[in-house]
Every structure is written in structure tokens, then in C-alpha cells.
Amino acid sequence: MLAILGSPHKKGATGKMLQYAVDVAAKEGWQVDIVYLYEKNLAYCKGCNICLQTAKCVMQDDIVELTRLMSACDMVVLASPVYWANVPAVVKNLFDRFRGTAMAETKTFPKPRFSPNQRFFLLTACNTPAPFSFLMGQSVGAKKSMKEFFKTGGMKYAGCCVWTGMNKKEIPSRVRRKIKKALS
């Protein structure tokens, strides 16, 4: 399992959810690799489009390691906070840098390059309480962005947990149950 944290706060809401997912996965026997995006050296995508022909980014930074990890895993768990109804720039940049790795462009629809045997599970947290987080599109926008990337790449959707109104210090029990179910 590849666990990716798209937040600068390891002990924040998304960090807590990801750590819980990692703990559950380890107990279930998964081999887990953890990536903290804010600690990685990932230059911004230059839009050169070479990756569409080569299936890999030409810039040689930490994307090389991330490409290897993403290609080798059975499951990706991406934890990202909601920033202005979307994912933070570091997560969006990861998607941009993986463009040619995740898909090949054709005359009609993108052709997935990830294995259809791979699955993805999403974790996100939003300060806006429910139901306003959903009605106002806050967490919906972030979830849509993450889901679109992985589905376009060909991975199977394994679910999503949204922690809204995260003024609570502990992960809500419904979120814990959903994480456990997805990884068991």
C-alpha cells in the first residue's frame, strides 16, 4: 500500500486519518510505504508533454521514486485536506507530474496506464461542518479532483472518508469504521 499525505501537518486531521489507515493496513498484513508530499522535491510541471509519449516525467527529482512506488503498489491511500474546495497545490502538482504516467492521450478518450488491479482510497478533511461542507461544495471539489485523477489512470475506486467540521480532536468513529472496512 502506498500512503500519501498531501498536508504539511502530520498530526492534523488528514495526517491522523492517514496514520490510522497505515496502522490498520499494517495489522492486516499490508506492506506500507508512506510519502509526505511536503517533504519531497517535486518541481512544478512545465507542460512539455514529453511524458505523454514516454509515460514518465523527464524532470529527474523525487517523481522518479514516486513513480516506482505508485507502479508497484496494490492500493493507494491519498489523504488531502480541502483548500478552497480543492486539493492543495502540492497534490495538484503530483497529479500534473503524473499526467503521462497515469494516462496516454488518444483522439477520443484518455487511455489508462495504471493497472486495473490497483485500487485507491481517499481521505479528506474540511473545517466546514456537514451538511454545509457538501452543500457548498467544499469537500466535494477536493474529492472530485482526487477521484478523477485515479479513475482516469485506470485504478478502481475503493471509497472515500470525509471528516467535516474537524474541530474535534479525535477521528470520528464513522470515519474509523469506513477506513477499517476499506483496508480489511
Identify the role of each PLM range:
Residues 132-184:
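Glycine-rich phosphate/pyrophosphate-binding loop and the adjoining helix
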